[in-house]
């Protein structure tokens, strides 16, 4: 089993690697740094995400996170040296084109993780209606949303999420016991049910996770 933590901040990387080092005398095999433009659940507070979102300039957003990336890499390097091994670092979040990939590698990372760009491809096995939701989305449709897991997420606004953001509670049809500590009678909606709707292409009832650049998709392409 490999240890591959996903972190967004220097503090998170330091705590995780220190814990594994002290308790298990092990370190990570790989570290993924997920930036503020990623899709799905995000390792930032809503306030931090809104601060990044205040700037529409893509270059600014990238550079404003560069210092954090370098700090995380320094933490990883410390444990790489201690254990005498290579710990590859992969950068994710907002890497949509060649320029973004080039910028990521200029920071010294070993690899990149790309998701949103590949959703609207023939090779992606997502339901066609899910892909079409990306293609139809405008920049303004992509918002930071509520999630039952207690973390902010990035998704496409649709009838389902409009109800949630308006304060409506959508009761789970059946509790699947998917999350420890979850209280079905209190959560705004069931994360599993909403993601299953997305997988089935039932986009009006789904949580449509996406990266910040999903609106840039114009058509179904091929890899």
Q: At which residue positions do the language-model features occur?
A:
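Charged, low-complexity, helix/coiled-coil-prone segments
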Residues: 2-12, 169-178
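Active-site glycine- and acidic-residue-rich loops that bind
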Residues: 4-21, 95
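Conserved active-site-proximal phosphate/metal-binding subdomains
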Residues: 28, 38-90, 96-223
